Amino acid sequence: ATANIDGDRGLGIIVTPKAMDIAIEKAKNVGMGVVTIHNSRHLGMASYHALKAVDNDMIGMCMTSCPPGVLPTFGAEPVLGTNPIAIAAPADKEAPFVFDAAMSAVAGNKLGLARRNGTQLLAGWVADHDGSPIMEEVDPPTPGYEGSASSYLLPLGGTRELGSHKGYGMMCLVDILGGILTGGGYGMNPGRPNFGHYVAAYNIEAFMDTKEFKRTMDEWINMLNSSKPAPGHDRVMYPGQPEHEAVIERSKKGIPLHYEVIDWFKDICGELSIPFFLV
């Protein structure tokens, strides 16, 4: 029910779908499949790979051990990656449950978006160079690796009092399963950009009737959606629902792009002599 793949220092977005295909085939035969990948690079959106299992009426999981950029709780040195985890489960009439989140206080890309949009980071997202959480809005840090950034991401939770030990523990879990278990080390070791990946597929039919599972998922999702919202909020949503609704809207109205992204595409197309079209 297991396999291990050498990523050949290539993009994880290429090899991870293949790894999930292998995990799915193993799950069809024995109920569960787990595949690890070492010596790889960025795998893109973790939930993309987890959702491949959903397409086969299975529960999918994907996690990736990333290069360091996040402080451990009580730490002043970034020794852990953002280490995202994605889990996806099918439903019947409702959209799939899809959880996909970095185990840092905020995803690394949010820092780049803040720089691009000229906005500040919220309190508890980053710490200064001595590891003290910055509990006020602050400009996004200057990019850098191995100690050269101007500030560092905190674990999910921000401070120990607000539960950063939980985010810290989850990052460690990903380093173990998506790093050490792959045989390829972890973010800090071997000292170069190093990604390890872990994918798993759970065949629902090996545990219970698939139709009953999906029916109960609908019931559970409806329970969440129908629960009472807090003041200032219209409704309660479940993980994956906002993204599902965004796909529907953008399929009709198009995808909004920041002008810097458009300029980047123009420049790259010009360098490579590729026609540029924007519709």
Mark where each language-model region is.
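Active-site cofactor/substrate anionic-group-binding motifs, chiefly glycine-
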Residues: 1-24
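Phosphate/diphosphate-binding glycine-rich loops and adjacent basic-rich segments that engage nucleotide
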Residues: 70-145
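Secondary-shell segments that build the walls of catalytic and ion/ligand-binding clefts
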Residues: 119-186
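A glycine-rich phosphate/pyrophosphate-binding beta-strand-loop-alpha-helix module
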Residues: 17, 21, 25-65, 71
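General beta-strand structural signal in soluble alpha/beta enzymes
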Residues: 5-7, 28, 34-39, 60-64, ...
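Glycine-rich phosphate/pyrophosphate-binding loops
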Residues: 57-69, 174-193
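Catalytic-core signal marking the mid-to-C-terminal active-site face
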Residues: 176-179, 186-279
